[in-house]
């Protein structure tokens, strides 16, 4: 299988730190234990020296060399019975969304550390001061040393006005 490179344009909405550029002639460091582990499981998550460091705890590139690719549809804050969890409670909705993503990747035979890409769609009705909640919750699920690639988009609204966030994911599960 040919490697697939996913290059993600960063959207630094989840933090206020400033990106740092690497020196052009900087020596390359040996891969971290997490990077070696990810590579052994058919996915290499990394940040090229030629790009600005991410400011919001995600990887710029996910290289897939082998494994079963699983695409998870956008998840909203519905429980297994189809009831909305956390009406008007952004944190509760984010938590339920991540529980749904976890259930989906586990149903496919993997775990949350197999997730290599997260796409967030957040309703503009959410107070911007609440956006860091997404990262707080996310960090309790992902490998923060090698976080998935991510894109965060503010949308006018989701299909139903009571839905505050929707997240879709891509996972690569070792065969």
What positions do the PLM features span?
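N-terminal presequence-like segments and the immediate start of the first folded domain
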Residues: 9-99, 103-108, 113-116, 122-175
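Sec-dependent signal peptide recognition
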Residues: 1-8
């Amino acid at each position: 299988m040919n490697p697939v490179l996913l290059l993600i344009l960063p959207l630094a909405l989840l933090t206020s730190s400033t990106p740092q550029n690497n020196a052009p002639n900087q020596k390359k460091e040996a891969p971290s234990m997490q990077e070696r582990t990810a590579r052994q499981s058919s996915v290499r998550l990394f940040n090229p020296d030629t790009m600005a460091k991410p400011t919001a705890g995600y990887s710029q590139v996910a290289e897939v060399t082998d494994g079963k690719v699983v695409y998870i549809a956008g998840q909203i804050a519905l429980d297994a019975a189809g009831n909305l969890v956390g009406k008007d409670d952004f944190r509760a909705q984010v938590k339920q969304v991540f529980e749904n993503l976890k259930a989906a990747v586990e149903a496919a035979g993997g775990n949350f550390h197999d997730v290599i890409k997260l796409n967030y769609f957040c309703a503009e009705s959410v107070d911007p001061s609440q956006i860091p909640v997404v990262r707080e919750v996310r960090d309790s699920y992902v490998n923060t040393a090698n976080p998935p690639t991510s894109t965060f988009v503010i949308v006018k609204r989701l299909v139903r006005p009571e839905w505050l966030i929707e997240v879709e994911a891509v996972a690569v599960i070792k065969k």
